[in-house]
Amino acid sequence: MPKFYCEYCSIYLTHSSPAGRKQHSQGRKHISAKVEYFQRLVREQFFQPPVFLGQTPPIFPGNFRAINHSLGPPMMGVFPGFAPLQTPNIIPQGMMNGIPGGLPGPIPGVPPVPVPMPAIPVIPTELPNMKIDLNQHNAPSVNSTSTTGAQ
């Protein structure tokens, strides 16, 4: 029959049944050994001197990533939700099937890809169901009812 070892008390239990383990874990000796175990663990791990004794501490602690300057300057004028514009004569890398890296320049005999125009928001100047007659000045609109006149 396998014996149960209590890591907190550093003993083998004579009764390895679930009831025997439960009785041991509720005992005074086990609880005090468990408290002492965790207090010792906290003292050893959390109150250690810093690793960089005698040295200057690192400027950027943690997961600081160095900036990759090989990519060039950051792109300017790219709005969120819009793809950056490319020159029309350059095919993006990987767009040509069977040719790794794409082509270095324009393809002879093929017109360049047009650059899409940025979307200009259209502001409505008229309300729905409202027609304005530009030929008559100070005249009521076609859809409005006139309050002047014979009844």
Swiss-Prot record:
What SMART domains does its record include? ZnF_U1 (SM00451)
MF terms per GO, please?
A: mRNA binding; pre-mRNA 5'-splice site binding; U1 snRNA binding; zinc ion binding
Please indicate which superkingdom the organism of origin belongs to. Eukaryota
> Which SUPFAM superfamilies would you find in this protein's record?
beta-beta-alpha zinc fingers
Q: Among its keywords, does the record have Ribonucleoprotein?
A: yes
Q: Does the keyword Transferase apply?
A: no
Biological process according to GO: mRNA 5'-splice site recognition; spliceosomal snRNP assembly
Zinc finger feature spans (Matrin-type):
4-36
What subcellular compartments does it reside in? Nucleus
Report the main location listed first in the record.
Answer: nucleus
For this record, an example GO cellular component is: U2-type prespliceosome
Which keywords label this protein?
Metal-binding, Nucleus, Ribonucleoprotein, RNA-binding, Zinc, Zinc-finger
Relate the protein's function as given in its record: Component of the spliceosomal U1 snRNP, which is essential for recognition of the pre-mRNA 5' splice-site and the subsequent assembly of the spliceosome. U1-C is directly involved in initial 5' splice-site recognition for both constitutive and regulated alternative splicing. The interaction with the 5' splice-site seems to precede base-pairing between the pre-mRNA and the U1 snRNA. Stimulates commitment or early (E) complex formation by stabilizing the base pairing of the 5' end of the U1 snRNA and the 5' splice-site region.
Q: How does it assemble?
A: U1 snRNP is composed of the 7 core Sm proteins B/B', D1, D2, D3, E, F and G that assemble in a heptameric protein ring on the Sm site of the small nuclear RNA to form the core snRNP, and at least 3 U1 snRNP-specific proteins U1-70K, U1-A and U1-C. U1-C interacts with U1 snRNA and the 5' splice-site region of the pre-mRNA.
Family indicated by similarity: Belongs to the U1 small nuclear ribonucleoprotein C family.
Q: What is this protein called?
A: U1 small nuclear ribonucleoprotein C
Species annotation: Theileria annulata
